[in-house]
């Protein structure tokens, strides 16, 4: 009897497990999101999120997300989900960000919190597990943050991951694996990867310089030395400047009035500069002394750097100078393939249409500005012509007045 491949894998216990979807939010049910997301009351002036697909989009309904709506504000909003631990499994955090306002300074990242977070008191100092996503502030800061809280300390990545800084929607993905490796993707393409231990300073270094080692006193690091047999020539020392032999005292020089005459100085053609003995290879050269290293007694490997006991809340805790950013398509799962597929089915489906709509708006705006410029120039030309006509009319009236005055003068003469 022949068995199908899926059945055979199932019998062998090798069938792929269904992905665990811990959190997914696409805002497809109108204002119902307000029942799932909690505004922090830690400050009274936190900015407000609104549901919007923005000024341009690929699909007006599918592209709706949480949009920051007030300039120069802190924002603090979060959603809770069933707590889970990522011990022994992959963690994938994914979402889309759209800075349609051409952001100059502001965050576009998310934070994952443990279950003990008081959502109504969430603020910038609330302890989190992971912070991930883009952050832009001026030309100097355009990075993707990947920050882990390790034993109560927030540890930043040692690499610089550049984020997207245009006005379109982009997909950000963080993958943390149980072998203590990670991967960062933008628009479903890898932009960084590596080892958690290598790319963050979670642990003390494996090796340290031997505190008992010291460079031997006779260790010579000079590759070249002065030739002891070389000596300075007897005629070497000449002054750098000498009196000009061609200079003559002016005939009208009065020493009582002008003081003693001194000829100007010139560069001495025989001047050779500072003498230095020639260099030879140092026969005692031993190379650069390298401080020997030993195993660091304070280093202890940690196979669970990646692991957290509790993930339970996803939060948007950020500052924006210019509002307008849209967050959408949140996903927390343990399945890398599912996350990639979800990204392709959301961001991937609407990205082209979004760009087309933006390009069309830009072209319409360009034509509108051209038409306004043309109209303004025509109005300016019309005003200039009207002013010129007025000047011509004034000149004609002045000429007529002068002619009338001349005629009157001539007539008066004739009468006389």
Curated annotation (Swiss-Prot):
Cellular component terms (Gene Ontology): acrosomal vesicle; cell surface; cortical granule; cytolytic granule; cytoplasm; cytosol; endoplasmic reticulum; endoplasmic reticulum lumen
Sequence positions bearing N6-(2-hydroxyisobutyryl)lysine: 64
PANTHER family in UniProt: CALRETICULIN, CALRETICULIN AND CALNEXIN
Lineage: Eukaryota, Metazoa, Chordata, Craniata, Vertebrata
Region (Interaction with PPIB) location: 237-270
Motif placement: Prevents secretion from ER: 413-416
Function: Calcium-binding chaperone that promotes folding, oligomeric assembly and quality control in the endoplasmic reticulum (ER) via the calreticulin/calnexin cycle. This lectin interacts transiently with almost all of the monoglucosylated glycoproteins that are synthesized in the ER. Interacts with the DNA-binding domain of NR3C1 and mediates its nuclear export. Involved in maternal gene expression regulation. May participate in oocyte maturation via the regulation of calcium homeostasis.
Gene: Calr
Region (Disordered): 193-277, 350-416
Domain comment, as recorded: Can be divided into a N-terminal globular domain, a proline-rich P-domain forming an elongated arm-like structure and a C-terminal acidic domain. The P-domain binds one molecule of calcium with high affinity, whereas the acidic C-domain binds multiple calcium ions with low affinity. The interaction with glycans occurs through a binding site in the globular lectin domain.
PROSITE patterns from the UniProt entry: CALRETICULIN_1 (PS00803), CALRETICULIN_2 (PS00804), CALRETICULIN_REPEAT (PS00805), ER_TARGET (PS00014)
Pfam families assigned to the protein according to its UniProt record, in alphabetical order: Calreticulin
Main subcellular location of this protein, as a coarse class: endoplasmic reticulum
Residue numbers spanned by region P-domain: 198-308
Binding annotation for Ca(2+): 26, 62, 64, 328
Quaternary state and interactors: Monomer. Component of an EIF2 complex at least composed of CELF1/CUGBP1, CALR, CALR3, EIF2S1, EIF2S2, HSP90B1 and HSPA5. Interacts with GABARAP, NR3C1 and TRIM21. Interacts with PPIB and SPACA9. Interacts (via P-domain) with PDIA5. Interacts with PDIA3/ERp57. Interacts with CLCC1.
Entry's family note: Belongs to the calreticulin family.
Region named N-domain: 18-197
Residues noted as binding an alpha-D-glucoside in the record, renumbered to the chain: 109, 111, 128, 135, 317
Record's protein name: Calreticulin
Signal peptide residues on this chain, from the entry's feature table: 1-17
Regions of compositional bias (Basic and acidic residues) in chain numbering: 207-251, 352-379
Residues covered by region (C-domain): 309-416
